[in-house]
Amino acid sequence: MLCAGNGGKELPRAKVFEGGSLVSKDYEDLKRRYFGTEHGNVLFLDPFETVYLTEKGEIDPETPEGEPMSVEELLSFFERRRPGFRAGYVVYRDLTERGYVVKSGFKYGGRFRVYEEDPDREHSKYVVRVVEPDTELSTRDVLRATRLAHSVRKDFVLAVVEDVEEPRIEYVMWRWKRL
């Protein structure tokens, strides 16, 4: 696919698989803007990055067989493999559009870790867990997540997604404080 916004150049092609997508050439601009992780001579994009960059018209996703994929097809593809993917995507898109750099946060007990600036120069500031309004959370769950985030010098943020179709997100932040 050609893109008028980049001088008519072809968009980087992204081969989609269960874990995200792989871009094998013309990905330098994406990498410079902190999208993906470079492995050898390919850029690995996680599922959220894959959908976001497709929605923004910055990559051209395709199946392993070379068939093009739309944003809706990508959302359905990843949702089948990861329940709650759409709610996570709504939060990913919101944070990215607010200027944050958003990466996986599973290592820290959340869906995302969020950087306010250059992730090569600073540590992430927040660990974000995504929930829907009917999600039951015990006080123990919240305290455990807050304490874990504190132990790695981050604030714990709960992102409550009210509606994935007409996105409404409520962010609640906790900090661990010794008295």
From Swiss-Prot:
Family: Belongs to the tRNA-intron endonuclease family. Archaeal short subfamily.
Keywords of this entry: Lyase, tRNA processing
Taxonomic lineage from the root: Archaea, Methanobacteriati, Methanobacteriota, Methanomada group, Methanopyri
Gene3D superfamilies, per the entry: 3.40.1350.10, tRNA intron endonuclease, N-terminal domain
Gene: endA
NCBIfam families, sorted: endA (TIGR00324)
HAMAP family to which the protein is assigned, alphabetical: EndA_short
Pfam families according to UniProt: tRNA_int_endo, tRNA_int_endo_N
Entry protein name: tRNA-splicing endonuclease
